[in-house]
């Protein structure tokens, strides 16, 4: 089993489908004896450049441990899923479970009185 970090950029009009998407991919990973070490929903954010005439999208970050053949299945599924605008799969050398800089930044904002929430 290898460790991977996956970032998904999801269509902004599919906010009600994000939970279903996360559950679907979580089931695939867990049923294949894989593990999800970190799952972060960064929320709806401004894109650096327009993708399919969209300026905002939802971001999801996953750190998982799976085998190569299951990664190929996920890669194929990401490619043909219409609500996933872009995705990035990176192999990592070890498990990453610490909160990302995006979550830390939002936590700092929460402590300053901002009421934005993070779903992990």
Curated annotation (Swiss-Prot):
Look up the domain of life of the source. Bacteria
- Annotated PROSITE patterns: RIBOSOMAL_S6
- Signal sequence interval, chain numbering: none
Gene Ontology annotations for the cellular component aspect, listed alphabetically: cytosolic small ribosomal subunit
For this UniProt entry, the molecular function terms from Gene Ontology, in alphabetical order, are: small ribosomal subunit rRNA binding; structural constituent of ribosome
Query: Pfam families this protein is in?
Result: Ribosomal_S6
Q: Could you tell me which InterPro entries the record lists for this protein?
A: Ribosomal_bS6, Ribosomal_bS6_CS, Ribosomal_bS6_sf, Ribosomal_S6_plastid/chlpt, Transl_elong_EF1B/ribsomal_bS6
The record's keywords, sorted A to Z, are: Ribonucleoprotein, Ribosomal protein, RNA-binding, rRNA-binding
TM region positions = none
Q: Which GO terms describe its biological process?
A: translation
NCBIfam families given for it? S6
Listed PANTHER family: MITOCHONDRIAL 28S RIBOSOMAL PROTEIN S6, SMALL RIBOSOMAL SUBUNIT PROTEIN BS6M
Q: What does the function comment of this entry state?
A: Binds together with bS18 to 16S ribosomal RNA.
Family membership, please give it. Answer: Belongs to the bacterial ribosomal protein bS6 family.
Query: What name goes with this protein?
Result: Small ribosomal subunit protein bS6
**Protein source organism:** Blochmanniella floridana
């Amino acid at each position: 089993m290898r460790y991977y970090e996956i970032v998904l950029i999801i269509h902004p009009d599919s906010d009600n489908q994000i939970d279903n998407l996360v559950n679907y991919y979580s089931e695939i990973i867990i049923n294949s004896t894989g593990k999800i070490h970190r799952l972060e929903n960064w929320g709806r954010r401004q894109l650096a450049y327009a993708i399919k005439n969209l300026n905002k999208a939802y971001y999801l970050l996953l750190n998982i441990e799976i085998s190569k053949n299951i990664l190929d299945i996920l890669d194929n599924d990401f490619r043909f899923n219409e609500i996933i605008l872009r995705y990035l799969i990176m192999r990592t050398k070890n498990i990453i479970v610490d909160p990302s800089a995006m979550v830390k930044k939002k936590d700092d904002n929460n402590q300053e009185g901002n009421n934005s929430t993070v779903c992990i």
